[in-house]
Amino acid sequence: MNAGYFKRVKELFPNASVVIDRFHLVQLINRALNVTRIKTMNTYRTASPAAAKDYRKLKRYWKLFLKESNDLDYQTYHYYRLFKKVITETEIMDYLLSLNSQLKETYQLYQDLLYCSKKNDYEGFKDLILMTKKHELSPSMETSILTLKKHLPRIKNTFQSTLSNGSLEGSINKIKLIKRIAYGYRNFYNYRDRILLSFSDKKIGNENAMVFAA
């Protein structure tokens, strides 16, 4: 969602409809929630020994914050060392959210936006963005909401389209993996050939190679 990117696309493809990949929408609010959790967590870092326990809980169970609330286990009880008792994931989240009202409101908006994205509900997504009261949210989530407001027309295209750059992202990650496994390539053409071999069964060779016939 880089402004420079959109400007360049408009110059090159003036009639194109821009679709923002859904992954980047989720990533934006995901990071905002995580920043909120960390800031809340740090307020307990230098507090009393009793409050410091909440610091460790907020740090330890960060993955639960990013989980869809419907996926939190509310039936299975496990012993959690920091709580010193058997408890469910839902109960852990209820406790952690009770520590800070701003964190709770930010988390709830995050979950609501995730739900609308999953259900492909653009009107619901838009209403959440436009009707959210800023004073109830963390500064990081407020910034993310302003970004989403700015891109609402493009976000609408996202909900109306099935396009995604997931395949391209997967290819890029595969290429990076090839390079990492080989600890880098000194010869570009060897690197290129290895990539092409991984993505195709076609016979390839070094276009700069010299061929001699007897």
Residue ranges of each PLM-predicted region?
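Short, surface-exposed amphipathic charged segments that create phosphate/polyanion-binding patches used
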Residues: 31-42
